Amino acid sequence: MQQLANQLFQKTIRRWVPFWRDVSPQHDLLKKLSLDPNLNAADEKVLLTWMDACLKDNGGEVAARMRAAELGRRFLDLNDEGRVRFLTLMADNYAVDEVRLTQVIESWLAANSSERTHLEADLRSALEPPRMKLLTQFNELPQGIKFLVDMRAELLRLRKEHPKLAPLEADLKRLLSAWFDVGLLQMEEINWRSSAELLEKLIAYEAVHAIQSWNDLKNRLDSDRRCFAFFHPNMPEEPLIFVEVALVKGMAGNVQELLDEAAPLEDISLADTAIFYSISNAQKGLSGISFGNFLIKQVVKKLQQE
């Protein structure tokens, strides 16, 4: 199943590239960003210049989006070593400006109450690392939010071996926590008539009881079963978390009874119990951003209406 998940990730990457090429038309500056997959020392200097240009909005908002799109495309072209260097550059060079922050804090401490009101905005600005603006530019691009979710998944994987990346990961988590507020998510039922792409992802993302085959999946989506997932408006066909439910009369002795493909269908008109036998977080990059309890509450409400 891990191999299938990796294949889906690569398929997603191939979809991003044309999207991002569309917002990166031919431009003299864009032609200069050509990076070795390992991101060598010379490339690092070019990359820093490029990131600076993104942050300064040279040429206006459209040009900044074009640069951010090209930056994202080049990140996807890097190998593991190159991505570590890319992320380390962001972490090291675009953190909070400690000198400016110290100056603002000293001004705030020396100010009277009325002056502090005006300095609060300066303090908030000084606490915001420049890389937050760059991450936000990625989010504004087609498939950008999925790009950032997967970037955080990489940061979570890398931060133990590369502790310098921890602050960047924390910044990205803060952004994603706001963008994935439960009020923005949409609950949808998944059934056997859902798209093949979505069903394929259920197989890949199931984290509790592995789905062994398409027949196994079909059994879990039969008339006496329910499957619900949360989706983000900017990540269609990408479940964030999903729950599998069995509608039965009484209680099952064990989960194997629920997964038995040879078991007869339950008459749902007689069902008096909903067994939530599996809940899976589908996006590693959203780890620590909890909406499982809210999904369960929504599903319970939906089933009560049935």
Question: Residue locations for each model-derived region?
Answer:
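Extended, composition-driven regions rather than compact fold-specific motifs
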Residues: M1-E306
